Design a protein with these regions (language model features):
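Short, surface-exposed loop or secondary-structure junction motifs
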Residues: 1-189, 196
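Short, low-complexity, polar/charged sequence segments that are solvent-exposed and flexible
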Residues: 20-23, 208-210, 232-237
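Low-complexity, compositionally biased segments
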Residues: 28-31, 136, 209, 229, ...
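Generic low-polarity alpha-helical segments
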Residues: 72, 208, 213-214, 264-266
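Small/flexible residues
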Residues: 97, 206, 274-276
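Extracytoplasmic/lumenal ectodomains and periplasmic regions of secretory and membrane proteins
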Residues: 125, 163-164, 176, 180-231
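Short, gly/Ser/Thr-rich active-site loops of penicillin-recognizing serine hydrolases
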Residues: 168-172, 181-188, 216-277
Length: 277
């Protein structure tokens, strides 16, 4: 579930809810999730677990439900007690973003201030935090901050063991994106996030030198990820999966145009050859 290899193929990115809407409970969201695509989505196993990587927001709904059933607490309360309080993350939680004092607010791509949105999955989308608090969370995953971490060093290292692959590359650990290999056989890791209105975030860490990058962006849909990709290349000499996807996407239109030109020339030369014969 953590590595998107459980056999779910929903590809679910969570849609937002207006400030005055009532959020569904966890079971209702599992049965009828609101997808960012606006299309109906079913959360079901379609592949043998462990055989393929497919992004699945539904997996994180199930993880949220597992935490609640095993702990006997609401997911938000459990994370508050076991993660936020030990790390003294006092500006972090799952409340509606517009209810936080001194919130930076939400901006559209034109820079206009917008009403914040609610999100139905706490585990996947609803976290609100500050850059200072997120720095504490990232530090706890380094050797320097191990004493304050709610996880053992062994658990943190296990998060970076590859479980998900795409196009032959290791891209996902246990809840972490594996951006690029380091020189000692480890991975630059972390996670990016994106949602409406024009929210983009990145928290990336190099365990080899304990350098990190934290970006919380509102008003641009990809700025944090774009800068994060440059940072990964600077740190490792390798492009990350987001940069690679962008290169492939940029090649599609020229590739199609080139194919069309080749086919057109082939037809013309074919006709010319027939006339000559």
């Amino acid at each position: 579930l953590l590595s998107h290899t459980a056999g779910f193929t929903d590809g679910l990115g969570f849609g937002d809810y207006a400030a005055d809407e009532t959020l569904p409970d966890l079971e209702d969201e599992l049965d009828n999730p609101r997808a960012s695509s606006g299309m109906p989505v079913e959360i079901r196993i379609n592949l043998e677990p462990g055989t393929e990587w497919h992004y699945s927001g539904g997996s994180y709904l199930l993880l949220e439900l597992l935490v609640e059933e095993i702990s006997g607490q609401a997911f938000e309360d459990y994370v508050q007690e076991t993660v936020f309080e030990p790390l003294e993350m006092s500006r972090t939680g799952y409340r509606f973003i517009d209810t936080y004092a001194n919130s930076a607010g939400s901006l559209g791509t034109d820079g206009a201030r917008m009403t914040g949105h609610q999100y139905a999955s706490s585990a996947a989308t609803a976290l609100a935090t500050s850059s200072a608090d997120l720095a504490k969370f990232v530090l706890a995953q380094t050797g320097t901050g191990a004493a304050s971490s709610p996880l053992s060093p062994e658990s943190v290292k296990a998060m970076r063991v590859p479980h998900g692959q795409s196009a032959g590359f290791d891209i996902w650990g246990l809840g972490t994106i594996l951006y690029a290999p380091t020189g000692n056989g480890d991975f630059l890791f972390g996670h990016d996030g994106a949602n409406e209105p024009a929210i983009n975030t990145a928290a990336r860490l190099n365990p080899e030198n304990e350098d990190a990058l934290i970006l919380l962006v509102s008003g641009h849909p990809s700025l944090a990820t774009d800068i994060g990709s440059d940072w990964v290349f600077w740190q490792s000499g390798y492009p990350d999966l987001f940069a690679t996807d962008a290169v492939f996407a940029s090649m599609v239109a020229p590739g199609l145009a080139g194919t069309l030109v080749i086919l057109t020339l082939a037809v013309l030369f074919g006709k010319r050859s027939r006339r000559l014969t």
